[in-house]
Amino acid sequence: MDNERQKALDTVIKNMEKSFGKGAVMKLGDNKARRVSSISSGSVTLDNALGVGGYPKGRIVEIYGPESSGKTTVALHAIAEVQKQGGVAAFIDAEHALDPVYAEALGVDIDNLYLSQPDHGEQGLEIAEAFVRSGAVDIIVVDSVAALTPKAEIEGEMGDTHVGLQARLMSQALRKLSGAISKSNCTAVFINQIREKVGVMFGNPETTPGGRALKFYSSVRLEVRRAEQLKQGQEIVGNRTKIKVVKNKVAPPFRVAEVDIMYGQGISKEGELIDLGVENDIVDKSGAWYSYNGDRMGQGKENVKNYLKEHPEIKQDIDNKLRQKLGIFDGDIEEKDEKQAEAEKNENTNLFDEE
């Protein structure tokens, strides 16, 4: 580029920085954080399927699927992982159905989980926006989009029609939220249900409530479905669950993670370590027997799960070797010094006031 054009460009950039603040325009190569940072999902199998070691920071994630498929369980595991790393988590319980006993069993620190049970959709999304713009929250979960009922619908009569109200609400909210989520480096997880379109003869009749905006704004979309029941004798103790990455802007999509979700316990970390360990030649399987480093751990998967629970050091060793081989690591919450945190808070507050 010749000198005259470069001078003109430099002048324009200086003017833009005066108007909109430093960093409003930059060269892509000047950005230090080129690799997408992430937070662990709490499952090694899912972290591997997501391609970047977990849910990307500063992005929107949608988790959807049929009833009782494990959507909330998957989201709660991510909250537990964030809290283990010293991060802050918030949960917008629009369904008014969060079970604190179950959440605690999954490893969630319920004493330090910020919970809101909004009266209507607008209130829930405004609370979510305030949390995001504070710059102090690392993950926020909205459960669920389908339960974010517009205020007009709640205050109206039963049987009144409100065409497209929820879709417009979500579209407006996501337009406001997307920029703030990126700047605050917060991961926003929206849980969604599925509905069936009427009169669809060909193709998939299933769709998700809340319009199309969430599909567009999401960097990652996960479809959670039960594959089969897990039994001990005649008793059903859990479900084999398939989690398909149907959209991924940060890694190749359409990968599938299969996990065991046990009733009252959540994702069986021992189960996925066994499965992945065998696949990656870290755990040896001969018939029904499983061995690690030449030592037999047990016969049958359930016995090996119990063995790993009783020997946490072996479980951790297998986990470390798997993450090293697959190139995935626990997402770390970046520690910010007080000045940086205060600057971000002021910036986000100013943005909030302007809008």
Curated annotation (Swiss-Prot):
Transmembrane segments: none
Subcellular location as annotated: Cytoplasm
Region of interest (Disordered), ranges: 333-355
PROSITE patterns, sorted: RECA_1, RECA_2, RECA_3
InterPro entries: AAA+_ATPase, DNA_recomb/repair_RecA, DNA_recomb/repair_RecA_CS, P-loop_NTPase, RecA-like_C, RecA-like_N, RecA_ATP-bd, RecA_C_sf
GO cellular component terms attached to this protein's record: cytosol
Top-level taxonomic group: Bacteria
One MF annotation (Gene Ontology) recorded for this entry: ATP-dependent DNA damage sensor activity
Keywords: ATP-binding, Cytoplasm, DNA damage, DNA recombination, DNA repair, DNA-binding, Nucleotide-binding, SOS response
Main location: cytoplasm
Disulfide bond sites: none
Pfam families referenced in this protein's UniProt entry, alphabetically: RecA (PF00154), RecA_C (PF21096)
Biological-process GO terms, alphabetical: DNA recombination; DNA repair; SOS response
Bias (Basic and acidic residues) ranges: 336-347
Signal peptide: none
Protein purpose: Can catalyze the hydrolysis of ATP in the presence of single-stranded DNA, the ATP-dependent uptake of single-stranded DNA by duplex DNA, and the ATP-dependent hybridization of homologous single-stranded DNAs. It interacts with LexA causing its activation and leading to its autocatalytic cleavage.
Family: Belongs to the RecA family.
Protein name: Protein RecA
Source species of the chain: Staphylococcus carnosus (strain TM300)
